[in-house]
């Protein structure tokens, strides 16, 4: 998370230099308690003692820490891929995030031309997307996600507010 940084990732990449053991002892613990959540979002921060890449692009952090150590098996969504913390064109950013193990790429600017650029690198979605687990074809660990269950949980979350 962003807890150890005062940098706003909308504009610049926060870099956290905390020793890895301290991160495991304190920072990652709360996430272990939330490992059964259906959804989670990556933070655009860099843990310098773990990887040179931001979390969103780091296969090491996503696979070894989020998926294995924390035990998160749900849908992993990027924070807004167009934020200033990340470098490179949007298509490359989306590709790096998916290759690292994110399931969905979030794009929030509303710029349709940017959306088209990102969509070009994504796998083709069939009309039966809601009934199939297309995300499992993207995922590195190939575990199936039940899209229908996630959709129903999302609807319930919307009705809470």
Name every feature range the model reports, one short phrase each.
Residues 2-129, 133-144, 149, 156-157:
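Second-shell residues forming the walls of enzyme active-site clefts
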């Amino acid at each position: 998370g962003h807890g150890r940084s005062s940098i706003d990732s909308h504009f610049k990449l926060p870099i956290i230099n905390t020793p890895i053991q301290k991160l495991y002892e304190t920072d990652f613990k709360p996430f272990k308690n939330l490992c059964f959540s259906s959804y989670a979002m990556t933070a655009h921060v860099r843990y310098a003692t773990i990887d040179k890449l931001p979390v969103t692009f780091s296969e090491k952090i996503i696979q070894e820490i989020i998926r294995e150590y924390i035990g998160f098996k749900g849908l992993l969504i990027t924070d807004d891929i167009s934020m200033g913390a990340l470098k490179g064109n949007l298509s490359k950013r989306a590709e790096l995030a998916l290759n690292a193990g994110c399931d969905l790429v979030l794009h929030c600017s509303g710029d349709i031309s940017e959306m088209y650029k990102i969509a070009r690198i994504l796998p083709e979605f069939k009309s039966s997307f809601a009934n199939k687990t297309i995300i499992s074809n993207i995922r590195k660990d190939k575990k199936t996600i039940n899209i229908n269950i996630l959709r129903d949980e999302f609807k319930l979350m919307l009705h809470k507010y």
